[in-house]
Curated annotation (Swiss-Prot):
The keyword Protein transport applies. GO terms for biological process: protein transport. Part of the Tic complex. It comes from the Eukaryota. Keywords: Chloroplast, Membrane, Plastid, Plastid inner membrane, Protein transport, Transmembrane, Transmembrane helix, Transport. Signal peptide: none annotated. The chain crosses the membrane at residues 19-39, 60-80, 84-104, 123-143, 158-178, 200-220. The gene is TIC214. This is Protein TIC 214. Residues 819-839 are annotated as: Disordered. Involved in protein precursor import into chloroplasts. May be part of an intermediate translocation complex acting as a protein-conducting channel at the inner envelope. InterPro entries: TIC214 (IPR008896). It is a multi-pass membrane protein.
Amino acid sequence: MNTKILLSLPWPKLMDPYMLLGFYYGLLTTLPVGPSQILCVRSFLLGGNLSGLISISGSVLAQLITASSIYCSPIYLLLLRPHLLTIVAIPYTLLFCLVIKDFPNYQILRPVTSLRDSRVARLFLISFFFQILNPIMLPNSVLTRLIYLYFFRYSTNTVFMVSTFMGWLTGQAAFNFFSRLLLSRVKGDSPILYLVAKRFIYATFSIVSISYAVAYLGRAPVSFWTKKFMNESHDREMNLWEIAEYSDLLWWFFKPWPTSFFDPSRANRSNRFVKNRRFHMNNTFYKGRTSTYFFEKCLTDGKERLSFLALPSLSIFGKEMYQSMAKSRRSFGIRLSYQNWVSKKLAKTKFFEKELTDQIKLLDTGSSFSKTMSRKTRLMGGKRRRIPRTYDPFVNNFRIRIPVSQTFLLEDDLGLSLWEWDKLATERKNRKAKKTVRINAIKDKIFTKDRRWKHGYGNPLPWEPLPSRSKRMFYFIFENRALYDYDLQNILKKIKSSPTLDVTWKEIMDLDYEDHILFLTYLEVGCCHRFGWISPLKAFLRKSSKSLSNVERRIRRLNKIGNLSMDLARYTILYFENNFDIPGGDGDFRYRKLRNVGITFAKGKPRSERLMKRYAKVSDFRRKFLKGSMRSRRRKTLLWKALQEKIRSSFFLRSAERTILFQSLIERLTTSSREEKFSELEKDTDYEFQKQLLDISLSAKRSLIGESKLTRSAIAARSDIGPIHNGRGYMLVFQSRFRKFIKLPVLIVLKNIGRILLRQNSEWNKDWTGWKKEIHINCTFDGEDFSQDELPPRWLREGIQIKIVYPFQLKPWHTDGNEKQHTLQRKHKEIGSKSRELKSKRKLKQKKHKFTYLTVLGYQTDIPFGTIQKKTSFWKPVRRKLIRICKRSLPRQIKQAYQFIHSRFEKVSKLNSTPSKKLNLISNLRQGGKLLSDYSLDEKSWMKTSSTNYVNEKTKPNCNVISNSERFIAIGGEMSPANVTRKQLVTRDQVEREFLMSIVAVDSKNLLDEKIDDPYSKITSKDLETGDTTSGDINLVNSTKFERKQLVDSEEAGLSLYLLVRELIETFVSVLINLPFTINRIFVHYFTEFLALYTKLAGILDNINEGSNLSTRSKSLQFDLPSQTCIYIDMWNIGMRGSLNLDLLVNDKRSSSNCGVKNRQSGIYVETDGVSNLYQPKMYEKQTPVHYNLIATKFLSPEIRNNHVNDLTMCFDTETGKTDEEFFDEKVARSIENWGFLNKSCKLDEINWNEWLYSLSRYNLPLTAWRNIAPRKWKVCLSELSSIETNTITELKDQVSQNKLHSYYSIYTKKSFLRNKISNFSKLRKHRNLLQNLTDSVQNGDVENLSVQRDIMEQRFHCKSCIQKSSRGGRNRISKFVHFLSSNVESKNNLNLQIDLLSWLDPDIAKTKIFLKKKKKAKQLKNPLLRNHYRYRYVLDISGRFQKVLNQLNDLTLDEREDADYIFRWKFKFETELEKFRNLISLTRMLGDDQDLITLCTNIEVNSDLLNLQFNAKTKRDMFHNLSVVSAHRLRLVFDDQDLLYKIINPLLKFKGRLRGIFRRRLYRNVYNGSYISNLSHILTERNCKQSCLYNIDDLLSPRRRREFRFLYCLLSPKIEYSQYISRIKKIDNAEKKQTLYHLPRPIRIQKIKRFLWPSHRLEEAACTGRSCVGVMTGSRFVTLRIRMYPIPLN
């Protein structure tokens, strides 16, 4: 009670995370030191406290204005958009720096004592303006972070706002306090006069201000008058009557109200980003593109959510829409349109409510649910042909274009004649011809540009002919050329022979580079035909006079550039692969060092034209900048080390990357001592001295770099000769193929063979993966990537480079991350500080290239014609590891050998009686005695000890199993401490452990010499102590440490050597004597294991042979037994909602009395006579108590058990009964009584079997209830099963001899304790799931607890097919069984049993566990375990003369499907029957006669009931509704492969659904067959029964109406009273309570509406809402409207 009062107090509620977070971020806004803070401190130090307070007040006011800009858009646009304040910021900063640079006079150093001082206004304005300009001059990262938090998270949270304001005030107060403290300390501690010190303070702050201004001046934004779009026209005013001349504006004027504010083609930023650097360590092969989707808040299901699919134009749409709503007071027209739209939607809402109420009333009168449901409306064309729907990828949960499947059946295949097929074929041919005529819009733009270029400048295309004057000039230039130049001679022959033969520009481009440059130079000088191959800038720049001449005559909208950018994003591949996309033209970007462009092609391939781009050494800075705001972003990015060599301005020095040398934790630990620190200092001084000696000046380094570049250029220039290119190209191609396919595979094979011979794990997969990762790319001579498979054109004349991406390096072994970390730590500990520092600096200088270039001799370079990379030796790590192993292990082994020999000498010299004791060793071994303690602690002592004691010894009937846990040991059923029973355990010679579930008989030995691998019975050295726990050798080695200093005489040394040799001989003889016993023991051990495996396999084969004789069973049975037995076996493991056991709900007094031994940990009684003993081993003892962890479990022998499977019950004792009362609630108990679980389970017997099966089909009862109600035939089969098991156990006991009982071993009986623990845990989990399912059994959307009854009744429509599938019989037997059920009077109302057999038909159980007698069959399958005896596969057997025609028909339909407008996609359950039906239609068309249709159906095994569905209109419509899905195809405007977020998130979201779909598809494929479709007409007629309580009321509406209803309800005010509708539904509930349906148990109620607010992840609903309610019809618009499809309700 006190706790509740304490929680109700207001002060704990104030301590909210929002409050702490707001206070933290408010405090952080004042921490960064910028120009405004520096000026405030300067005012305190120079002008005193009043001056500082005035400066702080100006800064505080500016910060308040900046924070308020979050809620006021004009202030936000004024402050945070740099283009508007650029003109003010830069001049003001320069002026301020120039003013404060020089010291004016001493007036400024006097303190401010009054507010009337002229300096007050100046100080206030300076601090104010610098704080306002702070986001531009010095971007505050913390303030920016706070702004984003306001926007996206806490903008409406009052607690957060107040706490932020308090934190901000605290920060300002702290800043004021510390500034005053600094002033007092400077005044008090100044060694000189404070007035003189002010001069130094003034100079210091002037230097700081100037450095800030200079450093951030280079980051100033682009000026306001910058023109970013060169070809963008200017808007101008016009009259209203001129609008009719422009169709686009006129169309926009008459748009509906919400969509008139939306412009889908307007983009806020660019869509592409291209890297400038060609040779880079992280170079990629594809151009990267930024995503077009951004984050935005949305309102879904009444909650604000953050969506990642918002387009940039969404913000424009929302802004304009809300502005129009806000201006409703001023504009009557806008307010009227908005009110009209809302009133229409509210009227539609009332109509929907009335329609839903009428449908509910129809259900009350007794109408069927199928007739009451709303029907879908479709548009119909001529001859009642339905117009297909457009394919909507969002509605069907697909984001990609779906190819047409080859197994789906077209609607046209069902009823078209031959002449209709011919007509359809001609129509499709005409349609294809029209499609070929169409040209893409982007191609039109490119060709128009090209024609405009051609008319303006005369740039020819490659296939255009040369003009006559150009031909004459060509003939004049190359008339006297040598005859061996065949290309020139061919062109000259064409010009000489006849003037009609055309010479194209392509032939000119095929000439040598010098020839066509010479020809084009003459053309440029002679002004005959201007062509821009010498100066691309003149050729491709557009004249501004012509392009802007007609600007004022026409109006261009701003979204034209946006349209072009969207088209480019859509046709990126087409645009960049086109031959006319010439770099340097009017495109989006231009290369930095582009010199000229040429067109090349491969011989014999006229379509392989490629643009060859050649680059200059100096960048072309006349190129056009990127469109958009990329320049400002590029200016604010950090300049990485790879780009620092290009820095030429002091403004960028602050952004340069600086290397940070840090010392790791391991290095600190290794240099912790004082001596090591002094040594480190000495080494550092030596290193600095050497560095000064070897230091090279910066100019010298630059000269060296320049010389290396010049050297590479010289080598490339000398190699740029035709014959050299020829030989070099062939050598490079040979080296590439040799390395990839011969050298590396051979080395990998040899390495793995060597590892296998050295007994190491093979690394074939890792090496082969690295080999596959290596890619060879053919490049041009200048290093530009061309292709991976094809060689570049003219590679023998112009040269080639081969680029190796991810080069493979063979290593002796592959190390994991952990091993690498350990090796690095070892290296850090071993290597000194000097080498460590040198290595770190060397690593910083090195760049790990992901690609290299191949040389002629097979070496690799980082760049073309660069320095050869040094290859790491393969044997170097091997040599290092061998040296390391030798250094570590060899001295230790030598020392141990020396100590061992020395201890032997000492032992012999001290113990003179040793020979007499050692001679008794052989006699003790022959008499069967024990070995000495030297062998007691060996790991393989069971091989070294003598086994003569166990050869003829029989096992005792009652053996005590000893286990230790918590210092207690159980002996003979009594618990005693470990120290009391120590002596008794030591003297015990033999202990045999035998557990009946999974423990094997273990070799008897001394427990002190054994480590038991059992989690519950571990005997450690702490619990049990022995008198002699160490070996003799260890004692002797330890004793030599104290006796090493004693001298040994020569006689004693000789005697000790003699005794040592004698002892070694005796040891060798004893080993030879023990060798036969050891071999015999090993043989017996493995023989018993093989015997256990053989008996287990024999039992499995016998069960399989029984299953093979199932089909020979008598066919007279109408109710087949194996299906019921499968249900009987699997019922224990399967329950409602996955795994639910109703053991606690069984009201059976007989079962409660037969409880087993108590398990104190889990509170469960387990009697092991039930099904859980199916996996027991075949040898038992009468009574074997086992004690572990203070738990006693008792196992009974099979002699006590009867031949039947006894009851297996689980009950709770008095102690656990208390926990039951805690878990069981009164509501749960009342629900159990209302549902009637206890009564129904008590009334079950053999007579009312069908009634029980009908009522409790989804529940999982124990075997006691099953045995009470099972038929007599089941019990007979069950007794046969138990007798078979008993016979198997006795046969196995006879086969195993009693003398080998102690060494019995089985691979199936390991760790019984672990198995028992898992089984008990599963039982506890099932009981816990029981309570959870009883309390949480209501599904999402249910109000009454009727989900279980509804799920039972939903199985009515497919139970026939399930039972027919599980009966394992033919069609005759199925029909007889159905006839038997229909003729039975008692089960007339239960015609369709509610049995969900889908999960019970487990193939592994249904195929192996057969409870029949053994009958052998002559012919069996290869794998009987996977054979299905009851599944029928209908294979179509068609003769060869029909097969060829059938294939032709299938090929024809595949071609027709590609152009199909819409198709009927059959569900996956009916694909098997669909294929037969399809073949029937194809053969009917081929024969052209339908008279002999029944015979044809019989031959191809097609059910004749399918034909009835064709002629029955009602069933045909229902069949198409239930078995097919209508779909059509529509192209997307934005491809999914261009959406980065989609590629990241979509596979994760759909992975679980795909797995679930695959599992469900496999399950239904085994259960459903052709009989389901044959009984479809019967099922459809039986659905007319009154089952309205099984459905949700919102299912009465169509999906489209439901989506509209949801949207319209969001428009209503949240204060609407729903009492009227709730009262109506309650009246309906009361009326339904009075009815009593014969097929449902009580209670019976109709579910209430609770699922109108659908889940927020259904994004496709927004698309439908946008189309139907808002009037948006195009795809791009509903993509954006799905984020903000509901307006925010106004409170």
